[in-house]
Amino acid sequence: AEAYAAVPRIGRRTRLGPKQRESAWAVFAFVRERLSTRGVVTTADIYGRLTRWVEDGGQLPFTHVVVDEAQDLSVAQARFLAAVGRAGTADALFFTGDLGQRIFHLPFSWAKLGLDVRGRAQVLKVCYRTSHQIRRAADRLLAGEIADQDGIEESRRGTVSVFDGPDPVVELFDDASLETVGVGKW
């Protein structure tokens, strides 16, 4: 509980006070106990076990890893990949990702977990998956410069798409059934 209370929480929007952290820890402890009683583990637990196995000299059945959509990695997955990278050659890991597409996890420092890509990252400026119209609409919603927790910045300026499509339509509906009808008409 004390270790949990002392962990810095970079990127969190609302900070928890000591009493709130204590309450949260009680919930986590309860869930952990329930999982243990049922013989169930979380995905994070699996990655933690794999990380320890690699760090203890476990022999990997591969020499290189390519990670797509790297912006969606969890902390446990990033720790595992850092262990894989330390166990392999200098070029054992290759990541592709888009900071502007991070939607699943709160930001965290890759460098603090052992994945320091500063100075070795390349920003690609040609988009093959999204039309000009959708990309421009999305760019209006994002800041011109996006930075991660390690200070790596990615500029949206100069990015181009290779095809056109219809303009995105934004509509508001009063309820889910009207939204379903609206989507069906599209």
Stretches with model-predicted labels:
Residues 20, 26-40, 51-186:
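Conserved helicase motor core of SF1/SF2 NTP-dependent helicases
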Residues 2-8, 40-48:
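Short coil/turn segments at secondary-structure boundaries
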Residues 1-20:
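ATP-hydrolysis module of ASCE/P-loop NTPase motor domains
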